[in-house]
């Protein structure tokens, strides 16, 4: 099995509601980055802002029930289904119950608990 992985362009920062406005202002007003609020239909994320961060996109997600922030990453695979089986053989199982996502993606976690969205390389992930 010759599966290749590479980092994706999307980075999500899950932010507690009490710190959300200050965090958005930091990226927009202090760092002067391009920050745009985007519509989101997700039961666990109440608001989201897209931040252009060099070649990457940082998603500032307001999560009402969080007490601290978390950073979630994107990982792409050359063979999505094969990668899912390969990761399971290494003890890395999907955890799609974390948050609603498209059917052709999975949530996984590294051993330290960093959440990653796994998707097929060369496909576009949309909210």
Regions found by a protein language model. Give the residues of each.
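N-terminal beta-strand motif that seeds the catalytic metal site of vicinal oxygen chelate
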Residues: 1-24, 71-73, 122-127
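Conserved short beta-strand elements that form part of the metal-binding/catalytic scaffold
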Residues: 34-71, 115-122
């Amino acid at each position: 099995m010759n599966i290749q992985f590479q980092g994706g362009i999307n980075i999500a920062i899950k932010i507690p509601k009490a710190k959300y406005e200050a965090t958005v202002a930091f990226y927009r007003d202090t760092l002067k980055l391009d920050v745009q609020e985007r519509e989101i239909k997700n039961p666990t994320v109440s608001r989201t802002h897209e931040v252009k961060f060099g070649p990457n996109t940082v998603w500032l997600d307001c999560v009402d029930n969080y007490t601290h922030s978390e950073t979630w990453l994107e990982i792409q695979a050359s063979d999505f289904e094969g990668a899912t089986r390969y990761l399971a053989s290494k003890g890395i199982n999907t955890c799609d119950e974390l948050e609603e996502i498209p059917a052709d993606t999975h949530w996984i976690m590294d051993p330290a608990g960093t959440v990653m969205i796994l998707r097929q390389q060369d496909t576009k992930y949309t909210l």
